[in-house]
Structures are given as C-alpha cells and as structure tokens.
C-alpha cells in the first residue's frame, strides 16, 4: 500500500483560551483495510482527539438495490453524475467480490475494527457512519461498542473542551441545533462533504470533518476530478474549506488509480484566541 502523507491545518477559535489548542487527527475511508504505518503516525502526532469520519468498513448493496444514501444522490446529483456513479458501483462490486473470495468482507471489517480499538488507546476516538456503515452486523456492532471509541449517528456528547457530534446519511436538524448551541468548541463528523452547504452551513460549528470524496480520485491543478454525490470537478474533494476539513482517504477502492492524490492523514489544530481568565 502507498505511503500515507500527513497534511497539517490550523484554525483559530474564540471558544478556547489564548495559549490553548486542540489537536485533531482525521481518519477516513479505510474501507476494511488496515493501512501500513497509520497507528505509528497517530502515535507520533499525539492528537488530543481522533475523528473517524465514516467508511471505516466496507459493505455493498446488491446491484440495483437502493437505500437512503442512493436516494439522496438521485435527488441532488446531475443525471450524468448518477449514471457514472451507477457504473462505478457495478464495477466496484465485481472486483470487490473477486478480492474477497479468500477473505470474507465480515473478516476484513472485524480486522479493521480492531484498529479502531488501537486508535482509542492513543486518544479519545469518535466514529460517525459513512455510506458503508448503513447495515452493521451484530458482530460489528459489538466490536464497535467494545473498542472504546464513541459511535455517533445523529448524536453528540460533551467533552472537556466542548462537544463532538456525528451525523449519518439523514442528518437530524434538532441534533445539529443542539450541538451548535452548546458551550465550548463544537466539532461535527459528517462523512459527506456535499452535506455542508445542504444541511450544515446554517449551524454555528467550529469544525466539520468529512471524507467520502477520496480526493476526487485524480487531482489536476489542485482539484479533484470526480466525487460521489458531487459529480465532476467537485467543490470539496480534499483539504480545508473555511471551517470544513475534507480528508482524502486512506485507501483506494476502485480499479482507477489515485493520481497526484496520496493517502491522506489530516491533522488540524484549533488554536484558542479568547482572552485568558485571570
């Protein structure tokens, strides 16, 4: 597997005192793989928090079957993008099936869930679902619960610095409202970058963390070529967009190579600018 590149980002927030900082590692789109060197990098970076923004696992629906995720794409994507996504889905399903003749998807997913437990030993870890976590098996749910990570699907939890929330394929507006009105730093995990303008921009959040776009698969002149849910030349395929950080992912799931698009471990530091209390 290709080497992982660490990308670094900084943002200021008035919800932390000056001189204080919150360091977050964004892990996204493992798709049942265990990337070589990921745990070592996380230990070296010493994050205060690890955010796993979806598609840790890999689950495919049978060809032709649709769920809420596909209906969301159908409702918001241009027709040409929908056709291309449908084609890629069929190709991926074929090659994934061939790859898993020797190891079932369940076995691979359980292996990467062990990685989730190792991440939780490094720093408090929060996991929100992507489109591949639509249907978790009972064994997978038990492994997530035992990992020490917090699973957040349309839910949020208080922390010593503020709050962390996570949404699924159908964001809960009331949950988002409650999170954005909380005290302290407000961090949201949302797998789908295209949801930012659609559902999240109206909420006051310090940081939104996403994946899903895989960097646009092929990057030309600093822009991705294609992303599911956004189509050709996506607006948000990888990098920092204001207070929205999109990870480029940590694996390749298609037969199309990642060109000019290395595996990505983003590290974002939120730096406090509020006057310190005397």
Regions found by a protein language model. Name each.
Residues 1-37, 45, 63-64, 73, ...:
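Acidic, histidine-bearing metal-coordination/catalytic regions of metal-dependent phosphoesterases
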Residues 1, 67-103, 218-243, 255-260:
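Alpha-helical membrane-targeting segments
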Residues 126, 193-274:
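Conserved beta-sheet core of the metallophosphoesterase superfamily
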Residues 4, 12-25, 149, 156-166, ...:
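Beta-strand-turn-beta hairpins that frame and shape the catalytic cleft
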Residues 36-159:
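Core catalytic region of metal-dependent phosphoesterases/phosphodiesterases
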Residues 25-29, 49-55, 103, 124-131, ...:
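Active-site neighborhood of phospho(di)ester-bond hydrolases with catalytic His/Asp-centered motifs
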Residues 137-138, 142-149, 155-199, 203, ...:
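Binuclear metal-dependent hydrolase catalytic cores centered on His/Asp/Glu-rich metal-binding motifs
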């Amino acid at each position: 597997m290709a080497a992982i590149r660490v990308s670094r980002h900084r943002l200021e927030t008035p919800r932390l005192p000056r001189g204080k900082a919150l360091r977050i590692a964004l892990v996204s789109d493992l798709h049942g793989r265990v990337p070589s060197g990921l745990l070592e990098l996380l230990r070296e970076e010493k994050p205060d928090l690890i955010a796993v923004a979806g598609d840790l696992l890999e689950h495919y629906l049978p060809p032709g079957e649709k769920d809420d995720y596909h209906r969301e794409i159908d409702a918001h994507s241009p027709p040409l993008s929908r056709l291309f996504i449908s084609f890629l889905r069929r190709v991926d399903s074929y090659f994934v099936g061939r790859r898993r003749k020797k190891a079932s998807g369940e076995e691979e997913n359980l292996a990467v869930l062990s990685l989730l437990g190792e991440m939780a030993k490094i720093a408090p870890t929060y996991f929100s679902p992507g489109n591949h976590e639509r249907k978790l098996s009972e064994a997978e749910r038990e492994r997530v619960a035992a990992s020490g990570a917090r699973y957040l699907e349309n839910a949020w939890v208080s922390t010593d610095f503020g709050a962390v929330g996570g949404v699924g394929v159908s964001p809960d507006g009331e949950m988002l409202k409650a999170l954005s009105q909380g005290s302290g730093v407000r961090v949201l995990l949302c797998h789908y970058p295209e949801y930012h303008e659609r559902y999240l921009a109206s909420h006051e959040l310090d940081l939104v963390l996403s994946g899903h776009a895989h960097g646009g698969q092929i990057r030309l002149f600093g822009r991705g070529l294609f992303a599911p849910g956004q189509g050709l030349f996506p607006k948000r395929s990888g990098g920092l967009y204001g207070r929205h950080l999109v990870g480029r992912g940590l694996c390749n799931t298609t037969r199309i190579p990642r060109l000019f698009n290395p595996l990505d471990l983003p590290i974002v530091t939120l730096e406090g600018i509020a006057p310190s209390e005397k």
